[in-house]
Amino acid sequence: MTILDDLQWRGLYADCTDLAALTQRLGQGPVTLYCGFDPTADSLHVGNLVPLLALRRFQLHGHHPIALAGGATGMVGDPSGRSAERNLLTPDQVAHNIASIKQQLGRFLDFDATTNPARMVDNSTWTAPISFLEFLRDVGKHFSVNAMLAKESVRARLESESGISYTEFSYMLLQAHDFLHLRETMNCELQVGATDQWGNITAGTDLIRKKLGAPAWGLTFPLLTKSDGTKYGKSTSGAVYLDPKRTTPYRFYQFFVQAEDADVIKLLKVLTFLSAEEITALDTDLKANPGARAAQKALARAVTTLVHGDTECANAIRASEIMFGGGLDGISESLFQDVVGEIPTKELEAAKLSGAGAPLVELLVHAGLAPSKGQARKDIDGGGIYVNNARVGEASRAVTTGELLFGKYLLLRKGKRTYTVVKIV
């Protein structure tokens, strides 16, 4: 299977400036390609995985990938896919974000490959030395304003209430210049990106044709969306980031394990390196036994391992088991706090657990797991109450400080999934 065959099977092909010519060129040998990542935040997010993993897919097929960190373009802001002007970042913010993003890019590509090592560049290194007048003469001269206004990214903003500034209007010239520079200095013939980058990419192929008379291609992938058409990559608490400080590995894992049945096979194709045979088998299993959620677990395991590594993925799976009655032995306090972060929490004075401890029936009422002590006794007698995920057998049971997790937490559960954390203050 060629790289283009693989992309098409995975649903990663949207458009190409000249598919027949690119197919022929790829058949002649390895090409150098690039994709840009602007430092709009200090971490990449789930949506960035599509182009980033595409670079890796090309590398696995023997091609030469370049990851471009947008130290220059990040100072301007891309209008593509935006309904309003971006807030300009300060040079210090851009520098901080670039440093963080470069570190993340380095985890997904092989920079030590023997025959086709990946490379990383920062467009500020060749953009910063150019004067404004030089840029207007050497780049701006080759662009028709009429053609720029016809680009979807510009036209959509012109039709919006906020309009578009000259700063963002000029963004496509900067990206076009990047492609030209890489074509001249690194023989980069292909730029890849999401469909919202089509206008910027074709600006680059046009500039290369006019300035160099040399071939260059653009290839785009569909935006990562759910079955209902909305963008994929956000949880109820916001964007899902690759940086563990912004989205913990546990929450990252949970985001994917909760994928809808209608989305999971598509996500397996787009966000993992599982083979067609493996994904087809998971699809068959999903249709036969959707309740097992084997496809979702495979997705979460594959993507979490890819982004955070084997150890963090194993920890995330272990933590997930807590919410399904798993034991708490060996769980760290930070992991416990992450898991129970969205569980209702009730505070309790430490004195209540002193001496012989507090009656469990009273704690259940305090925690909101029972309306009365009488109902709490019935629930305990019925085998439906758990303390730290261990079933309680006697309604007369008391809870003491010795049972506190990390000296300050008590995990109470009613039934299979109704939890409350009691925090000692």
Curated annotation (Swiss-Prot):
<comment type="similarity">
    <text>Belongs to the class-I aminoacyl-tRNA synthetase family. TyrS type 1 subfamily.</text>
</comment>
<dbReference type="InterPro" id="IPR014729">
    <property type="entry name" value="Rossmann-like_a/b/a_fold"/>
</dbReference>
<keyword id="KW-0436">Ligase</keyword>
<dbReference type="GO" id="GO:0003723">
    <property type="term" value="F:RNA binding"/>
</dbReference>
<feature type="binding site">
    <location>
        <position position="34"/>
    </location>
    <ligand>
        <name>L-tyrosine</name>
    </ligand>
</feature>
<keyword id="KW-0030">Aminoacyl-tRNA synthetase</keyword>
<dbReference type="InterPro" id="IPR002942">
    <property type="entry name" value="S4_RNA-bd"/>
</dbReference>
<feature type="binding site">
    <location>
        <position position="234"/>
    </location>
    <ligand>
        <name>ATP</name>
    </ligand>
</feature>
<dbReference type="InterPro" id="IPR024107">
    <property type="entry name" value="Tyr-tRNA-ligase_bac_1"/>
</dbReference>
<dbReference type="InterPro" id="IPR054608">
    <property type="entry name" value="SYY-like_C"/>
</dbReference>
<dbReference type="Pfam" id="PF22421">
    <property type="entry name" value="SYY_C-terminal"/>
</dbReference>
<comment type="subunit">
    <text>Homodimer.</text>
</comment>
<dbReference type="GO" id="GO:0005829">
    <property type="term" value="C:cytosol"/>
</dbReference>
<dbReference type="GO" id="GO:0006437">
    <property type="term" value="P:tyrosyl-tRNA aminoacylation"/>
</dbReference>
<dbReference type="InterPro" id="IPR001412">
    <property type="entry name" value="aa-tRNA-synth_I_CS"/>
</dbReference>
<protein>
    <recommendedName>
        <fullName>Tyrosine--tRNA ligase</fullName>
        <ecNumber>6.1.1.1</ecNumber>
    </recommendedName>
</protein>
<dbReference type="GO" id="GO:0004831">
    <property type="term" value="F:tyrosine-tRNA ligase activity"/>
</dbReference>
<feature type="domain" description="S4 RNA-binding">
    <location>
        <begin position="358"/>
        <end position="424"/>
    </location>
</feature>
<dbReference type="InterPro" id="IPR002307">
    <property type="entry name" value="Tyr-tRNA-ligase"/>
</dbReference>
<keyword id="KW-0648">Protein biosynthesis</keyword>
<feature type="binding site">
    <location>
        <position position="171"/>
    </location>
    <ligand>
        <name>L-tyrosine</name>
    </ligand>
</feature>
<keyword id="KW-0547">Nucleotide-binding</keyword>
<feature type="binding site">
    <location>
        <position position="175"/>
    </location>
    <ligand>
        <name>L-tyrosine</name>
    </ligand>
</feature>
<feature type="short sequence motif" description="'KMSKS' region">
    <location>
        <begin position="231"/>
        <end position="235"/>
    </location>
</feature>
<comment type="function">
    <text>Catalyzes the attachment of tyrosine to tRNA(Tyr) in a two-step reaction: tyrosine is first activated by ATP to form Tyr-AMP and then transferred to the acceptor end of tRNA(Tyr).</text>
</comment>
<dbReference type="Pfam" id="PF00579">
    <property type="entry name" value="tRNA-synt_1b"/>
</dbReference>
<dbReference type="InterPro" id="IPR002305">
    <property type="entry name" value="aa-tRNA-synth_Ic"/>
</dbReference>
<dbReference type="InterPro" id="IPR024088">
    <property type="entry name" value="Tyr-tRNA-ligase_bac-type"/>
</dbReference>
<keyword id="KW-0963">Cytoplasm</keyword>
<dbReference type="GO" id="GO:0005524">
    <property type="term" value="F:ATP binding"/>
</dbReference>
<keyword id="KW-0694">RNA-binding</keyword>
<dbReference type="InterPro" id="IPR036986">
    <property type="entry name" value="S4_RNA-bd_sf"/>
</dbReference>
<feature type="short sequence motif" description="'HIGH' region">
    <location>
        <begin position="39"/>
        <end position="48"/>
    </location>
</feature>
<keyword id="KW-0067">ATP-binding</keyword>
